Regions:
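Conserved acidic catalytic loop of the alpha/beta-hydrolase fold
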Residues: 63-81
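Residue in the alpha/beta-hydrolase core beta-strand immediately N-terminal to the catalytic nucleophile
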Residues: 46, 82, 105-108
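Conserved HGGG/HGGXW glycine-rich cap/lid loop of the alpha/beta-hydrolase fold
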Residues: 6-58, 72
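Active-site micro-motifs of SAM-dependent methyltransferase domains
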Residues: 24, 90, 114-115
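Gly/Ala-rich beta-loop-alpha elbow adjacent to hydrolase catalytic centers
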Residues: 85-89, 93
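Flexible "cap/lid" loop of the alpha/beta hydrolase fold
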Residues: 94-99, 105-135
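Glycine-centered tight turns that cap/initiate beta-strands
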Residues: 41, 102-103
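N-terminal cap/lid segment of alpha/beta-hydrolase-fold proteins
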Residues: 1-4
C-alpha cells in the first residue's frame, strides 16, 4: 500500500463505509454521517487522489481503488463492512464486492455505471481523459 487514507469516523456498531464519487471526497456525505452514526460505525473515506488522501504511485483505476479499500479495511481490522457508494463510489463498491464478496455485509449503490457499454463513447473518452490527466498532474 503506497498511500494512507484520510477518513471521517463516527458511531458504533457494524461498519458502514461511505464511498464518494469522482472529483469529490468524504465531505460529500457530511449531511448523512450524523444520522447513519446512530446505528452504524460510519467511516467516510477519501479515495486515492481525492480530498486529503494522496495520489500515490499505483494505478488510478476502479480496480486499484477496490484493492485500496481492502488494504484500508485490513489496517482498520474490519473483517466485514456495509458499503454505500455514490457514482464512482458505487463502482468501487461493486468491484470490491465482486473481488472480495466475503468481506461485504450489504451494498447500497447509487448512480454506479460499472458496465461501460451503457455510456456513450464521447462521455467515456472524457472520463478516461480526466483520469489520465489526473495521473499526469500527480
Amino acid at each position: 500500500m503506497d498511500i494512507k487514507h484520510f477518513y471521517i469516523e463516527k458511531g458504533q456498531g457494524e461498519p458502514l463505509i461511505l464511498l464518494h464519487g469522482n472529483g469529490e471526497d468524504s465531505t460529500y456525505f457530511v449531511n448523512q454521517i450524523d444520522e447513519f452514526s446512530l446505528n452504524y460505525r460510519v467511516i467516510a473515506l477519501d479515495t486515492r487522489g481525492h480530498g486529503q488522501t494522496p495520489r500515490g504511485d499505483s494505478a488510478f483505476t476502479i480496480r486499484q481503488f477496490a484493492d485500496d479499500l481492502l488494504g484500508f479495511l485490513d489496517r482498520m481490522d474490519i473483517q466485514k463492512a456495509n458499503l454505500l457508494g455514490f457514482s464512482d463510489g458505487a463502482n468501487i463498491a461493486m468491484c470490491f464486492a465482486a473481488k472480495y464478496s466475503e468481506r461485504v455485509l450489504k451494498l447500497v449503490l447509487n448512480g454506479g455505471n460499472l458496465d461501460t457499454k451503457g455510456i456513450e463513447e464521447e462521455i467515456q473518452n472524457k472520463i478516461e481523459n480526466a483520469y489520465e490527466s489526473a495521473k499526469m498532474d500527480a
